[in-house]
Amino acid sequence: MSTVFNTTPVDVLAEPMFFGSGLGIARYDIQRHKVFEELTEKQLSFFWRPEEVNLMMDGAQFNKLPEHQQNIFTNNLKYQSLLDSIQGRAPAAALAALVSDPSLDTWIQTWTFSETIHSRSYTHIMRNLYTDPAKVFDEILLDDAIMKRAESIGHYYDDVLNKTRQWQNQIAFVELAKETPEADERLERAIKQEAIAKRALMKSLYLCLHVINALEAIRFYVSFACTFNFHKNMEIMEGNAKIMKFIARDEQLHLKGTQYILRQLQTGVDGDEWVKIAHECEAEAAAIFMEVNRQEKEWAVHLFKDGGLPGLSVEILNRFIDYLTVSRMKQCGLPCEIVLESTKHPIPWIREYLNSDNVQSAPQEVELSAYLVAQIDNDVDENVLAGFRKYL
């Protein structure tokens, strides 16, 4: 992004998602990729605040749990706090400078903001469960099992940031060479170096998108399974389950967004060069998913090292991780080496929490979480109105 506001007229319907013209007017009347506008509207309709959920009863129930079950809950909370600390700033910081599609730009900003709500949720939970929440937060950076997962995510974001700076420097060198009299050879060399830097950045961005996709698709779900299990099979911690249900609902949107971007790049919608990059990076992208698979299985073992939860075990979680990995890799166009023994969902009841439409509750009994706000369809034309007039 060479400027925060491009004053040159641009056909937004012809702009690629990345590496196009600078962004100008923020407009939402037309979109090349309607998916991003739909995701933004859906995310805005989901707006929620963690303080809406009362956790007083959860705190009392948590204090009655045996120590190993308290540790399972706390460690998952720490892990999710770390993941959303990254996601609450990284998508906008790393991707926004490269975006040239207005609807994608708005979606990335909306997505990143929603992640900050998730981070605030963990603070809300900790304040209600622990007498000293600051101590729990301070322990996160000291936990090796958590931090090695952060390193594998942050590395790819940082690589995009570094390669973006290198590319921008090369662009500046090209402009400098143009101003140098009788320096055709220098200009030619600068243009060549800029092209090399741009392609390296494109590869870095493509792999980073897979890292983000794997994070949204797999990394949260061991924690989700444990949190929802407290409510489903132990009939406690309903407030926390509600908050995690809100978070899981948001993550489904974020996952859909990254999957869509990847498939568009892989199919050449934004140019043949992306198809070549997708082919070159296929093995590394698949390896990223398999590494996430391995790390999450390690995390399950770490969580259950001192004891388990009724209804869950390391074996069940491992099958759940494999089930997710196969499905998610297929959805983002990658080959998967895992062969499932069964195609049945290892934790079928979790769908109740991941799909809000499956839950029916009496409003007077529980706080409803399955409602939307500001969901009005404004695309009403004369044909629709004519259909209504027959009832007048």
Feature map (PLM): residue ranges:
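Non-heme di-metal
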Residues: 2-392
